[in-house]
A protein has these predicted regions:
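Alpha/beta-hydrolase fold catalytic core
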Residues: 1-23, 45-47
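Active-site loop/oxyanion-hole signature of alpha/beta-hydrolase fold enzymes
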Residues: 41, 50-93
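Active-site glycine-rich loops that stabilize anionic/oxyanionic intermediates
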Residues: 19-20, 28-31, 96
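Gly/Ala-rich beta-loop-alpha elbow adjacent to hydrolase catalytic centers
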Residues: 94-98, 102
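Serine-hydrolase catalytic-loop signature spanning alpha/beta hydrolases and amidase-signature enzymes
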Residues: 28-38, 49
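Flexible "cap/lid" loop of the alpha/beta hydrolase fold
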Residues: 103, 107-108, 114-149
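Alpha/beta-hydrolase active-site loop signature
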Residues: 30, 54-58, 123
Length: 156
């Protein structure tokens, strides 16, 4: 198993395969590095494909402190993967939760990105309308229900 350390000293599990221009795959809430297996199986013939488990997703470290988790931490973790693997620039592919991290990386570290592929990143809710957004999305209950299912049944 291969691990890197983030700039705040959290161990992240990663896999890298193939040669060529690097593509980094960032998984969704209910996934992990394996979510990208079909894409990596094909694209690793032509590119260096890197996938990793976000913090909180074993075998990556699961910090207990809530302050260890944020949108900023998520995009900085992508940079930590790049830095540890000596990847100067990469194509970044993110889905859902990983899409948000990918979007934030593109905004905050444009010089490290060759391209962004972002899917399921949200519908662009207006921040001042948080009450209506929460009613529409019911995000906290959906997330809690998903977490309970994963905890009880696992991810396989």
């Amino acid at each position: 198993m291969s691990f890197i350390k983030t700039d705040d000293n959290v161990k992240l599990f990663y896999e890298s395969t193939g040669k060529g221009e690097p593509i980094i795959f960032v998984h969704e809430f209910a996934g992990d590095y394996r979510s990208w297996e079909p894409q990596i199986n094909y694209l690793s013939r032509y590119y260096q494909c890197i996938s990793f488990c976000a913090r909180g997703y074993p075998p990556s470290e699961v910090p207990e402190n809530e302050s260890s988790y944020s949108q900023e931490r998520a995009w900085r973790d992508i940079l930590s993967v790049m830095d540890n693997l000596q990847v100067e620039k990469a194509h970044i592919v993110g889905l859902s939760m990983g899409g948000f991290a990918t979007l934030h990386l593109g905004i905050n570290a444009q010089d490290r990105v060759l391209s962004l592929v972002i899917a399921g990143c949200g519908y662009g809710a207006i921040p001042i309308d948080k009450t209506n957004f929460n009613k529409e999305a019911d995000f906290s209950n959906i997330s809690l229900d998903s977490a309970k299912i994963i905890l009880n049944k696992g991810m396989d």
